[in-house]
């Protein structure tokens, strides 16, 4: 997904380890609340592994555009679920 140029990993300056501890940093807390305002989503949310087929990655964000990002985050769904809904 990184090869598309639409995904990136964002870590805290104080914690650059790519693991679940990222979710507790102030930076990630802010990003999780505000990323959709800039067109990004948390790509692999907690408890959605069965849908995304990826483990929870609180550092991995994907650009989808502001409208889609706000819809995805408001509904608490994944990109896969969103795409399935709009294709109906």
Each model region followed by its residue ranges:
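Cell-envelope/glycan interface and biosynthesis
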Residues: 1-88
């Amino acid at each position: 997904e990184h090869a598309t140029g639409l995904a990136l990993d964002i870590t805290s300056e104080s914690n650059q380890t790519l693991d679940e501890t990222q979710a507790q940093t102030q930076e990630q807390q802010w990003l999780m609340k505000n990323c959709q305002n800039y067109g990004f989503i948390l790509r692999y949310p907690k408890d959605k592994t069965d849908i995304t087929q990826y483990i929870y990655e609180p550092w991995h964000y994907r650009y989808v555009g502001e409208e889609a990002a706000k819809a995805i985050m408001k509904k608490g769904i994944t990109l896969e679920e969103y795409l399935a809904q709009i294709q109906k």
